[in-house]
Every structure is written in structure tokens, then in C-alpha cells.
From Swiss-Prot:
Lineage: Bacteria, Pseudomonadati, Pseudomonadota, Betaproteobacteria, Burkholderiales
Uppermost EC category: transferase
SUPFAM superfamilies per UniProt: alpha/beta-Hydrolases
Pfam families attached to this UniProt entry: Abhydrolase_1 (PF00561)
PANTHER family named among the record's database cross-references: HOMOSERINE O-ACETYLTRANSFERASE (PTHR32268:SF11)
Cited InterPro entries: AB_hydrolase_1, AB_hydrolase_fold, HAT_MetX-like
Stated name of the protein: Homoserine O-succinyltransferase
Gene coding for it: metXS
Entry EC no(s): 2.3.1.46
Catalytic activity: L-homoserine + succinyl-CoA = O-succinyl-L-homoserine + CoA
Keywords: Acyltransferase, Amino-acid biosynthesis, Cytoplasm, Methionine biosynthesis, Transferase
């Protein structure tokens, strides 16, 4: 199916201070927003799509001045696609602390005239949800037909259903978890350590030195990317293949240059990421991942944490996702069913690991299409 076509982002400015979970507040801030489709007269067909770590408000479509910059979930959102923009008004919001136009470490601190850098406050999933709620208010949307997200975006969708139960009809959580495991926190710590130990980091104030801690960002991305793929997927894509010119002998070089195809792939991904992403943003977002644990306020009891939810849920996981394994989704499903919530759960047999939520898998997309048809029928009832 074709893309939704040319889209244009908009910047929303908010002057009312935003209270943050750390006890401080953000006095004034911008959020980058993109919308697709048409909001109906009743304002009842809106869907909020929450983004994952390195994504943004640019969910679907292309920009007129850069047609190669395709939205990160373009295969999911658009006319005739599972989230059909002929039926729904879809909103993408770039979260606070990001590096794609919303207020973050790269933004100018009005009190100093310099980039916030390391002084930008640590933000949480809950802070993002509160900021997104203000975007909804600007559109006059009192209740979303659905809030949807994959990975970290799924955590935001879950948080929406818990923080604003009266504003969410359906909550769609894909390849996500109600909290990070110790192993996942450990992966994030190793990635952050790579950035913090880069000589170009300068305590987070590298903008003043006109440098970027690219070496640390490369390693951080390489670590992360390994966790996004399954072992079978990596074996199929790369195996133990060596990088060799055509006709060259299949022999080792006995040095530390790139020899295996998988090494080349990881370095390419790391280089690409370091060119466009911001190191301070990476630190902030991974820490927000670490902190997300809505059951913490209930002595670790997830069932108690979801007691006041009212939404209907679609929870989807992928069999080869070892970053956020299906067991984590089943834990959430059980907690919701303990309160007799309406829950649809799908555990999809897909070989691509955590990144499967971004791919065009027929079973996965058919599930989403059918679920959104159900929501459309409710909206139009």
C-alpha cells in the first residue's frame, strides 16, 4: 500500500509549567507533533501513537524536502493500513528530552542562553504522558479511541490507561513490558557507560566544544541493536560469513579489523545512529526506561496497580523477542484479567526478535487491522 504521502510537522508551545516526577518543573517547552487523517465532529476517532527510544513524532508519510525520510511506522499507519487514516485521526508526539524538535538537552535554556545539555531534567514515562495529555487538550480531545505503542511506546500506552483511565477507550501495548528486568537495566547501563566514558562527552556539555561523543553513541547503539534481533534472525542474516571481495580466500586476517559480516552490520548501524542522535537524549530515555515501574507504588503488586483501569486492551508479543519476552506481556494480561478487564492477547510466532513490532508481518498486521475495525465500529455506533 502507498504511503499517506507528504506530511508536515507542527510545533506546539506550552507556557504553563509542567510538574515533573523528580519534583522540579519545566517552565516552558515545545512539543513536535504530526497528525494524519481527519478528526471527526465528535472528536471521538483520535488515536495517539507513542514512540520508542530512537523514534519521533514522524510516524508516517514523508517530508516534501526529504522524501527518503519515511515515518518510522509507515507500514502500520495510513490509508487502508491497519491503523487506517481514512477512519482515524492519528497523532504522533515527540517526547520531552528527545532530539527531534521537542524541548530537550539540545534546546536553549532561556535562563542561560546556552543549550541545556547535562542540566536538562531527568524525565519519566509519566512526565511524557502528562505532556501528551496537554497536546490532546489543545485538540479538544477528551478521550482517545486508542492509545498505542510498541516497546517504550507500549509503556507509555499502559501508563495512559493507568494515569488517565477516563481518557482511554482502548490501550494497545506491543512488544513491551510493565517494567524492565535487571538484565535490561544492565544493558542500558553498559550503553550509558560507553557514552559517559567517551572523551568527547565533556560531562554532557559537548555542544560548547563543538563535538559529539560519537564513539560512545556507536557502541551504545551496537549493544542495543544486538538485543533487538533474535539469534535465529542474526544467524540467517549473517551466520559466520566473512567480509571478502569476490574471489578472495575464505581465510582469517588475524587482526582486529572488521572481518565478519555481523561486525560490519553493527558498525554501520552504530555510525548511522551516531550521526543523527543525541547522546544526552540517549541517557535520558534509557533512564526513563529503567524507572518505569507502575507497580512500585503498590509494593510491587501489578494487579493492584491496574485496579482502577477501565480501558479495553490489546496486548501483543513476539515469540523470539528476548528483550521484552512474552512472559512479561502475560504478566500484564494476568493482572488485568484479575480485575476482569477486557483483554485480547496475541503471542505472534515471528523470527525477527524485538524489532518485529516495526515490520510488516502479515499475522501481526491482520491482528491490528481487525482490532482497529472493532474500534471503528464502536466509534461509529
Amino acid at each position: 500500500m502507498e504511503s499517506i504521502g507528504i506530511v508536515a510537522p507542527q510545533k506546539m508551545h506550552f507556557t504553563e509549567p509542567l510538574p515533573l516526577q523528580n519534583g522540579s518543573s519545566l517552565a516552558g517547552y515545545d512539543l513536535m507533533v504530526e497528525t494524519y487523517g481527519t478528526l471527526n465532529a465528535a472528536r471521538s476517532n483520535a488515536v495517539l501513537v507513542c514512540h520508542a527510544l530512537n523514534a519521533s513524532h514522524h510516524v508516517a508519510g514523508v517530508y516534501a524536502d526529504n522524501p527518503r525520510d519515511i515515518g518510522w511506522w509507515d507500514n502500520m499507519v495510513g490509508p487502508g493500513k491497519p491503523l487506517d487514516t481514512d477512519k482515524f485521526f492519528v497523532i504522533g508526539v515527540n517526547n520531552l528530552g528527545s532530539c527531534f524538535g521537542s524541548t530537550g538537552p539540545m534546546s536553549i535554556d532561556p535562563s542561560t542562553g546556552n543549550p541545556y545539555g547535562a542540566t536538562f531534567p531527568v524525565v519519566t514515562v509519566e512526565d511524557w504522558v502528562n505532556a501528551q495529555a496537554r497536546v490532546a487538550d489543545q485538540f479538544g480531545i477528551t478521550r482517545f479511541a486508542a492509545v498505542m505503542g510498541g516497546s517504550l511506546g507500549g509503556m507509555q500506552a499502559l501508563a495512559w490507561s493507568m494515569m488517565y483511565p477516563e481518557r482511554v477507550a482502548h490501550c494497545i501495548v506491543v512488544a513491551s513490558t510493565p517494567k524492565l528486568s535487571a538484565q535490561n537495566i544492565a544493558f542500558n547501563e553498559v550503553a550509558r557507560s560507553a557514552i559517559l566514558s567517551d572523551p568527547d562527552f565533556h560531562g554532557g556539555n559537548y555542544y560548547a566544544h563543538n563535538v559529539k561523543p560519537k564513539r560512545g553513541l556507536r557502541v551504545a547503539r551496537m549493544i542495543g541493536h544486538i538485543t533487538y534481533l533474535s539469534d535465529d534472525d542474526m544467524a540467517e542474516k549473517f551466520g559466520r560469513s566473512l567480509r571478502r571481495a569476490e574471489g578472495a580466500l575464505d581465510a582469517y586476517n588475524f587482526n582486529f579489523d572488521v572481518e565478519f559480516e555481523v561486525e560490519s552490520y553493527l558498525r554501520y548501524q552504530g555510525d548511522k545512529f551516531a550521526d543523527y542522535f543525541d547522546a544526552n537524549t540517549y541517557l535520558l530515555i534509557t533512564r526513563a526506561l529503567d524507572y518505569f515501574d507502575p507497580a512500585k507504588a503498590f509494593a510491587g503488586d501489578l494487579t493492584a496497580a491496574v485496579a482502577h483501569t477501565t480501558a479495553k486492551y490489546l496486548i501483543a508479543s513476539f515469540t523470539t523477542d528476548w528483550r521484552f519476552a512474552p512472559a512479561r506481556s502475560r504478566e500484564l494480561v494476568k493482572a488485568l484479567l484479575d480485575h476482569k478487564r477486557t483483554v485480547t492477547y496475541a503471542e505472534i510466532d515471528a523470527p525477527h526478535g524485538h524489532d518485529a513490532f516495526l515490520l510488516d508481518d502479515a499475522r501481526y498486521h491482520n491482528l491490528m487491522r481487525a482490532y482497529y475495525e472493532r474500534i471503528a465500529n464502536e466509534v461509529n455506533a
